[in-house]
């Protein structure tokens, strides 16, 4: 595993700076460019290269991004997928251009295929579908639009997380789920992991005491919600399941400020396994989503679609897995 020193050396900054950036230290004064470089180096060192032959002649792919640069820094999930896309495109010699939907070149399209990364409203989908090119939607189930998609089996990940907590004696569980809107503010996006949580809860033989909290999918979102929640009276659950590692980082900060020890006083389990999760204190137990591989696979799948005259709409689903580290305590 790469160390803080490895990241610092490649990013050309001090180990202390790396540590503070990876832990989202708000008192640190460094540029967004430096933060971006550190996060990208952390992703790069976390990546295991796969040797594949480069094709001689490849077309151009347009990547439509949902997140902007600042949002990528707040939640590394989409940064990691994007880097996987860029890495695979470079490996195969594919020309890749990147834009946000607001800059979508409808009247000046030179690409041969489109990868759309993120969540999109009906209005936004109508814009994208005006272009008669092969398309692949990543992290967005576009089957109802008759478009190919590549998604994560969030339900399976939720089951793994919650079964692990119960196996360790936790029957009082809080869930911090995320809330977000499409970029045009036309649609609220439900957190499918909260829905999966409810289905899991309904199937349990033993009663599960549940506390439900909602925040933005950011470090600060998790921090603010947990900080306010801790001010409330009453007993607290023995464990928190948090549907994104970014919110989990904010949660850890709020708990530390309240002198609540993780995992001795409260256990934490996250979701995504972003590159900084292993560097937190304690190292975060989380559900690993193969984000880099999703990015790589999206390039390969789109290239395959480009060579097919007729295709049946396909949804590819990836299974996440539990990464056991240090943030969950056994009560047995």
Residue ranges with predicted function:
Residues 19, 55-71, 172-182:
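Short beta-strand segments enriched in small/hydrophobic residues
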Residues 231-332:
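Flexible loop/turn connectors
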Residues 1-56:
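N-terminal helix-turn-helix DNA-binding module of bacterial transcription factors
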Residues 2, 58-163, 230-231, 235, ...:
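Alpha-helical recognition/docking segments in bacterial nutrient-uptake
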Residues 69-75, 100-102, 150-160, 176-227, ...:
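Hinge/beta->alpha junction and helix N-cap segments in small-molecule ligand-binding domains
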Residues 41, 84, 88, 192-204, ...:
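Alpha-helical structural signal in soluble globular domains
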